[in-house]
């Protein structure tokens, strides 16, 4: 956002103020951006868990501080002796060397454990654990008891809105506002945007990219071609595989891009009413979940693994109208 100056081109992000988990007994657990309000809400379900939340947040932020600088760097190839790869390996070793033996053990353990096991170390209430486990599985083809899902949690704690770490938000005006801001920024930098111009193939000659050829036959020359299509479409359909190393083509063919979730947009004639929550409660201006235990999440994942629709699916609902049109 900063590099492209998207706020200058009209993009405004409205921070999500909270979230909700509805339970099968008619109750709900609210979540708030405000730390103290969140702890008070946790007390309704477990005083012990409310007290543990501070330790949980501290440990999560500790892991975030370690991994965040690494995310913007290109991972090293451990089998390569190229200077860049050796430099990256040395950088990682220095980061690891800064940790104590205990911190290193905790970090390695955290990266490999499930979100279910991780939450068990802090909390006892099923609803509280279910509300926090969502950040370990959403957008993945994994269940809360799958190894590695604790690490996924970090990506949801490293979000940022206007300098507020851990915050998430909506684009005011909907997703189209992001496209408009990107278009405006691109054109301001001298770019030309072509609509309804499907690419037929990437033109390659003499082992070098020349440009792209459109479906209508038009050709655009370029020294560099950047693709936002998926890896298989880019290298197996838009690019003739004969121009690529056979081993690379094999790896692309084996790359898994199976979807793990579906999205349904529903137009309503009015705002939905939740009898147990007041309409102005900020917890409704965020994620709304209906799965109140980790066990139910895992059972939904079991059905997906068997190639069938989940009989009791994990549902994540949002009402963006309550937030973006302000």
Indicate residue ranges for each PLM-predicted region.
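Conserved N-terminal glycine-rich FAD pyrophosphate-binding loop of Rossmann-like flavoproteins
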Residues: 1
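Dinucleotide-binding Rossmann-like beta1-alpha1 core, especially the glycine-rich loop
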Residues: 4-72, 81
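A short, glycine/Asx- and small/polar-enriched loop/turn
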Residues: 25-26, 143-147, 203-210
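Catalytic cores of large soluble enzymes that bind and process phosphate-bearing ligands
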Residues: 30, 34, 48, 52, ...
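Active-site/ligand-binding neighborhood in enzyme catalytic cores
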Residues: 61-189
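General beta-strand structural signal in soluble alpha/beta enzymes
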Residues: 130-131, 195, 227
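Mid-domain catalytic core of redox enzymes
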Residues: 170-172, 198-324
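A conserved beta-strand/loop element that lines the FAD pocket in flavoprotein oxidoreductases
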Residues: 186-199
């Amino acid at each position: 956002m900063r590099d492209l100056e998207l706020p200058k081109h009209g993009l405004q992000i409205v921070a999500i103020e909270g979230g909700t988990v509805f339970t099968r007994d008619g109750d709900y657990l609210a979540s708030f951006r405000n730390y103290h309000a969140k702890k008070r809400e946790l007390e309704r379900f477990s005083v012990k868990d409310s007290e543990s939340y501070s330790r949980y947040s501290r440990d999560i932020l500790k892991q975030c501080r370690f991994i965040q600088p690494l995310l913007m760097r290109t991972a090293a190839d451990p089998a390569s002796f190229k200077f860049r790869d050796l430099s990256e390996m040395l950088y990682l070793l220095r980061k690891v060397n800064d940790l104590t033996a205990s911190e290193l053990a905790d970090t390695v353990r955290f990266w490999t454990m499930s979100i279910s096991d991780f939450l068990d170390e802090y909390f006892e209430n099923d609803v509280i654990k279910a509300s926090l486990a969502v950040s370990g599985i959403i957008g993945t083809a994994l269940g809360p008891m799958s190894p590695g899902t604790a690490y996924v949690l970090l990506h949801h704690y490293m979000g940022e809105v206007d300098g507020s770490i851990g915050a998430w938000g909506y684009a005011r005006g909907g997703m189209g506002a992001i496209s408009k801001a990107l278009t405006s920024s691109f054109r301001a930098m001298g770019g030309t945007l072509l609509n309804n111009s499907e690419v037929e193939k990437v033109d390659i000659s003499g082992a070098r990219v020349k440009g792209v050829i459109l479906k209508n036959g038009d050709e655009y020359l370029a020294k560099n071609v950047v693709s936002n299509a998926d890896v298989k479409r880019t290298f197996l359909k838009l690019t003739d595989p004969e121009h690529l190393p056979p081993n690379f083509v094999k790896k692309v063919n084996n790359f898994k891009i199976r979807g793990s979730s579906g999205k349904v947009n529903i137009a309503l004639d009015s705002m939905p009413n939740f009898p147990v929550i007041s309409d102005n409660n900020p917890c409704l201006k965020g994620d709304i979940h209906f799965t109140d235990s980790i066990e139910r999440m895992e059972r939904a994942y079991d059905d997906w693994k068997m190639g069938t629709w989940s009989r009791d699916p994990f549902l994540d609902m949002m009402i963006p109208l309550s937030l973006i049109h302000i």
